[in-house]
């Protein structure tokens, strides 16, 4: 189960504890006209994170999906999120897009910032 905390107006931290790793992972949702999910989490965390996002917005309404760097806990569930949010674009830096994103995501729905 995820813990949701509003850390600023319409900015939410979604925290998920993975007991077998004894680690907590944080994901951030900006609730806006064009909602942003920052950090997708690992693929195995997708059901928990998407349920938490669903308590705040319709996950299909996500417009932007981004992360700080390319590792499984930051963007491992990217493809699941792109499937759940048909109008969402993945957003990352140019080098990340060239080196990782287009190969990993297998989609042209990528944007560099």
Which residues does each PLM region occupy?
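Conserved beta-strand hairpin/beta-sheet module of binuclear metal-dependent hydrolase folds
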Residues: 2-57
């Amino acid at each position: 189960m995820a813990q949701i905390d509003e850390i600023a107006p319409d900015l939410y931290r979604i925290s998920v504890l993975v007991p077998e790793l004894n680690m907590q992972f944080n994901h951030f949702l900006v609730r806006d006209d064009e909602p942003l999910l920052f950090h997708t989490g690992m693929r195995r965390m997708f059901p928990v994170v998407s349920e938490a996002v669903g308590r705040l917005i319709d996950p299909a309404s996500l417009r932007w999906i981004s992360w700080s760097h390319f590792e499984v806990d930051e963007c491992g569930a990217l493809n699941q999120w792109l499937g759940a949010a048909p109008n969402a674009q993945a957003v990352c830096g140019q080098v990340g897009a060239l080196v990782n994103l287009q190969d990993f995501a297998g989609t042209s729905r990528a944007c560099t910032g």
